[in-house]
Amino acid sequence: MSEGGSKDSSGSECPVCYEKFRDLDGASRTLSCGHVFCHDCLVKYLLSTRVDGQVQRTIVCPICRYVTFLSKKSSRWPSMLDKSSQTLTVPVGLPSTPSPDRGGHTNPLVISHQVWRQSSSQGSQVPLDLLPSLPRESQIFIISRHGMPLGEQDSVLPRRSLAEISEASPAPSATRSFCCRSRALLLITLIAVVAVVAAILPWVLLVRKQA
């Protein structure tokens, strides 16, 4: 738990979409840093930060840049989950592209709300043009209480094996050794060529004089 957990971050509205939590039944979700957002804004963030179609298991708080870890939970009936629990229901296969701001930058949490509407049955928002193609089973993620500062994000990213790293980029000592061997081989070859020329040249000149 970071220092942000001690802040008064349980405000009455989502700091992203400014929707009142009292108008969104059970929609507030608290990250490990203590900042509170609505369910739909966090889902949009996860959709916009997918890598190769896979939802990431982390959320970076846009306020304090603290990383919150997520754990995946499978459920065939996501609508039956407790709305007050720290869960995020992420639809499978929904394309989502953040809209750039005036400076040309994109904020993953700031996505157009024009294509989203309030669902009367679940109290959550779904895209209007994607309702017919929604899968029956969604991905359920649980917001954990564990996190870390963004400066340590290198431990969050997937790591390659040591074999892949060494194969992709040789060690500096091996590179220097190879360069030294190449230079020594080139120098020996040059000395050998000069010695051969020095040995043959007098005989060539002598033959020309006799001729």
UniProtKB/Swiss-Prot annotation:
It is a single-pass membrane protein. Keywords: Membrane, Metal-binding, Transmembrane, Transmembrane helix, Zinc, Zinc-finger. It holds the Pfam family zf-RING_UBOX. The chain crosses the membrane at residues 187-207. It comes from the Eukaryota. PROSITE patterns: ZF_RING_1, ZF_RING_2. This is RING finger protein 222. It comes from Mus musculus (Mouse). The lineage of its organism: Eukaryota, Metazoa, Chordata, Craniata, Vertebrata. The gene is Rnf222.
